[in-house]
Amino acid sequence: MGASVWPDAVWLNNLLAVLQAAQLALLRLCHALGLTGDSHGQPAWPWARRIAGETLLIDPGLARQLAWSIGAMAFALLALVLALAWRRGQLASFGAGALALILAPWPTPGLVLSPAAPTSFHVSPTRFAVASIARGERVYTQHCAACHGDDGRGEGPLAASLSRWPPTLAGPLLGRRADGELFWHVVAGMRGRDGQPTMPAFGTTLGDADVWAVIDYMKALSAGTGARLQGTWPTPLALPDLPVQCAGAAPRPLADWRGTQRVRLVAVDGHAALPMEDPRFLTLLVTPDGHAPAEVPQFRAGCVAATPEAWAVMARIAGVPAAALPGTALLSDRQGWLRARGAPGQAAWRESDLLCTAGQAGGQRQSADARIDTPVDTPVDGLTALLLRMDAEPVRFVKGGFVH
């Protein structure tokens, strides 16, 4: 996992959150006043620039300059209000406000601002659902794989014929861009510094739903390829939403458990014993046909992912072939972030099963070979140790430079 917030950068986290909230509020205000219209069904960002949160994230010095400058502007505004309300101290108030503006460490605008698109602040309507990921796979296979490759590494059969090799999707690239900007790159295409196209525009070929779906699939593809080649998920990945069917109850979206309950997905094909229920998390069976086993013994898990598409999506995220999926388990934390993967037939959960860790956030990424592949060395069992660590190290995902 390479896109979290460092524990010692709480102030930066707060600054980014405030800046994002301010931009969203400004966008909503402009839209409400009729100063900007819609683009692809959502309010369009009316300016060619936005605050470069991704730059501030990697340049704390620049972020401090901006923070002090914002503070100076706030102080100057307060001084102006005080001067208008208090005549006797008018001169002193004006002077203090002017001095604050003069002494402020104004950052270079070209560093603080970055190019924006009309869809920069768009939000995906898909909820990162299994159905959307499955749809996105079909779109990707038809329109994207020839250049980006089946595994997303940018080595498709047409890649060598392009003026520039496609970027790999099996890395933190998707985590550095807001979903709205990824959407714009797909519909409007991309150009190099020389103005020549480096990626065709698909705005006339794909509908909005297809574009959002292929973005969802690229996230799953990135996770699976990263897990297979590097032993980690390159960026934090949410547990995909899907319908959950439990015995005697109406289907519910998996998102209903987000924020309250951990989730364990276990792939079963009818040939292995069902996992035991565990009060520490919701155990959800993933089956090839989306139906629960005919016989569920007492104390065994019986809730099932009620869609056959979940099988292929889980295999993609786990980075294993669909035929090798039975017995694989995925763990998500209470906030819905996927954190660990258990291999079939594994006797105990191990430290290396944790594929999304806060320790990787500061760039101290461990390779799969460097991690010790032994059970977690704690007085408790390996699974309990992993759950405790997941709770102690929550994911604070920064996408497009802003906290999600």
What is each stretch, according to the model?
Residues L78, W184, G203-G226, R389-A392:
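C-terminal capping alpha-helices of c-type cytochrome domains
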Residues A116-V139:
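Electrostatic cytochrome c docking/interface patches
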Residues G136, Y140-D150, M199, V214-M218:
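The canonical Cys-X-X-Cys-His
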Residues E137, R153-F183:
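Gly/Gly-Pro-rich "capping" loops immediately C-terminal to redox-active cysteine motifs
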Residues A160-S163, H185-W212:
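Axial heme c-ligation environment in periplasmic c-type cytochrome domains
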Residues G195, H291-R334:
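Short, internal strand/loop/helix patches
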Residues R228, Q261-R262, G319-H404:
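Thiol-/selenol-based redox modules, centered on thioredoxin-like
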Residues L254-P288:
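Short active-site neighborhood of thiol/selenol oxidoreductases, capturing the structured segment around
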